Amino acid sequence: MEKNTVTVPKTLFSQVIHIFKYAAINLGLPFLNGVMLGFGEIFAHAFIHSLGWAPGHTRIYSIQRHQYIQA
């Protein structure tokens, strides 16, 4: 018993659809992932700040200024 298989050539339209599908997965999902990570970081910072676990501002000390104050 032989099985008859018929191969249908891919049309240009189906190839274009596949290219867009793979591009959306490989380019769109990493972008969406980055956006969600950014929003999560903003939310976490706001949440921690509202609990009072972190100072309201960041202090940056310069070595030159520190040496200038000591002199």
UniProtKB/Swiss-Prot annotation:
The chain crosses the membrane at residues 22-44. Pfam families: TOM13. InterPro entries: OMP_MIM1/TOM13_mt. It is found in: Mitochondrion outer membrane. One of its GO terms (biological process) is protein insertion into mitochondrial outer membrane. Component of the mitochondrial outer import machinery (MIM) complex that mediates transport of proteins into mitochondrial compartments. Promotes the insertion of tom70 into the outer mitochondrial membrane. Promotes the insertion of atg43 into the outer mitochondrial membrane. The MIM complex cooperates with the receptor tom70 in binding of precursor proteins and promotes their insertion and assembly into the outer membrane. Involved in import of the subset of proteins with multiple alpha-helical transmembrane segments. This is Mitochondrial import protein 1. It comes from Schizosaccharomyces pombe (strain 972 / ATCC 24843) (Fission yeast). The lineage of its organism: Eukaryota, Fungi, Dikarya, Ascomycota, Taphrinomycotina.
